[in-house]
């Protein structure tokens, strides 16, 4: 299959620039992958798609305010860093601007001087490894000095940075939100749990590669970015029990899917506690190991995420669903509406 097979025209006005006032007021397109039937609902009605004994699996990663603005200590020149991932200790892989002026040994100061960094390694495509020096707790310093790294297609400033976090965000480390989870409120989750559905949490720290377009025509040549994931023993045991008793594993978002399917692929279809790095590329032809249904937002044309959804429901049905959503003026991408596929 080629990248062009997953293209579609999206009117720019359908790209949501701000979140809705109420998280669960977004639209929900329900798609039956067996019959092709589609239903237009609101997100709160996702509870009607869940049965007692099912497991709803969510990614509890928390987005770092990972964009930092500073000055080179020697020259005062302006520098922008975007934190990508913690490589070890106080060292981070970052995307730097202007990268060509940031050689090994360059020192950068941020804000009131509580945070500084030194470049320790030069990578390709504007990447650098930097070592941070700071007073106090790094994440607290970052919270006060950093800005939210909103996706490149969002041009509005975010009034409340918590709206780019899920209500259950806990484990700091992402450069982008697991946006399928943004629709859930604490009240809706309590209702779902009261129905007898198991709420299960895993962690996958979302990298900026999630926004990177596929640059090759042949999908077999595409290299996926790596992201860190973790599934606890308690969560794995719950999921094994759900499967054993005939319940479904229902993933919230592509990050939960990639974690579960990475583990299923690694352990021959079994669900085990695990942590590590995954670069799994799920595309049509993939044999599913764990996930029985999922919710997800509407994704960019020709993206690996559209390919993942197509691997589950079939390319033609997914593109039909997207065309339907465009006709019905659904909101797209991170702050947009959702679909539920079963």
Swiss-Prot record:
Alphabetized UniProt keyword annotations: Cytoplasm, Queuosine biosynthesis, S-adenosyl-L-methionine, Transferase
One annotated Gene Ontology cellular component of this protein: cytoplasm
Membrane listed as a keyword: no
Chief subcellular location: cytoplasm
Domain of life, per lineage: Bacteria
EC number(s) from the headed UniProt entry: 2.4.99.17
A molecular-function term among this protein's GO annotations: S-adenosylmethionine:tRNA ribosyltransferase-isomerase activity
Reaction(s) catalysed by this chain's protein: 7-aminomethyl-7-carbaguanosine(34) in tRNA + S-adenosyl-L-methionine = epoxyqueuosine(34) in tRNA + adenine + L-methionine + 2 H(+)
An example Gene Ontology biological process: tRNA wobble guanine modification
Annotated pathway: tRNA modification; tRNA-queuosine biosynthesis
Enzyme class: transferase
Location of the protein in the cell: Cytoplasm
PANTHER family for this protein: S-ADENOSYLMETHIONINE:TRNA RIBOSYLTRANSFERASE-ISOMERASE
HAMAP family for this protein: QueA
Function: Transfers and isomerizes the ribose moiety from AdoMet to the 7-aminomethyl group of 7-deazaguanine (preQ1-tRNA) to give epoxyqueuosine (oQ-tRNA).
NCBIfam families in the record: PRK00147.1 (NF001140), queA (TIGR00113)
Family: Belongs to the QueA family.
Subunit field text: Monomer.
Name of this protein: S-adenosylmethionine:tRNA ribosyltransferase-isomerase
């Amino acid at each position: 299959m080629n990248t062009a097979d997953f293209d579609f025209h999206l009117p720019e006005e359908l790209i949501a620039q701000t979140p809705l006032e109420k998280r669960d007021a977004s639209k929900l397109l329900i798609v039956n992958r067996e019959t092709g039937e589609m239903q237009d609902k609101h997100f709160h009605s996702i509870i009607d798609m869940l049965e007692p004994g099912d497991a709803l699996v969510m990614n509890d990663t928390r987005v770092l305010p990972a964009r930092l603005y500073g000055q080179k200590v020697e020259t005062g020149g302006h520098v922008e860093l975007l934190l990508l991932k913690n490589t070890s200790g106080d060292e981070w892989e970052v995307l730097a601007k202007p990268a060509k002026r940031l050689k090994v040994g360059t020192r950068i100061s941020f804000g009131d001087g509580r945070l500084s960094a030194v470049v320790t390694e030069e990578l390709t495509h504007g990447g650098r490894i930097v070592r941070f020096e700071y007073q106090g707790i790094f994440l607290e310093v970052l919270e006060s000095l950093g800005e939210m790294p909103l996706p490149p297609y969002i041009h509005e400033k975010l009034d409340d940075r918590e709206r780019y976090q899920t209500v259950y965000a806990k484990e700091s480390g992402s450069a982008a939100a697991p946006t399928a989870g943004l629709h859930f409120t604490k009240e809706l989750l309590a209702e779902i749990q009261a129905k007898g559905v198991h709420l299960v949490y895993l962690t996958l720290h979302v990298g900026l590669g999630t926004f990177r377009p596929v640059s090759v025509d042949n999908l077999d040549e595409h290299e996926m970015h790596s992201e860190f994931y973790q599934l606890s023993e308690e969560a794995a045991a719950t999921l094994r029990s759900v499967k054993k008793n005939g319940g479904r594993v229902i993933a919230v978002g592509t990050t939960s899917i990639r974690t579960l399917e990475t583990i299923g692929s690694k352990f021959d279809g079994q669900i085990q506690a695990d942590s590590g790095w995954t670069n799994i590329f799920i595309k049509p032809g993939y044999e599913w190991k764990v996930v029985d249904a999922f919710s997800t937002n509407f994704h960019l044309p020709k993206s690996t995420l559209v390919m993942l959804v197509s691997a589950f429901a079939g390319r033609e049905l997914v593109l039909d669903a997207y065309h339907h959503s465009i006709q019905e003026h659904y909101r797209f991408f991170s702050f947009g509406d959702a679909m539920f596929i079963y």
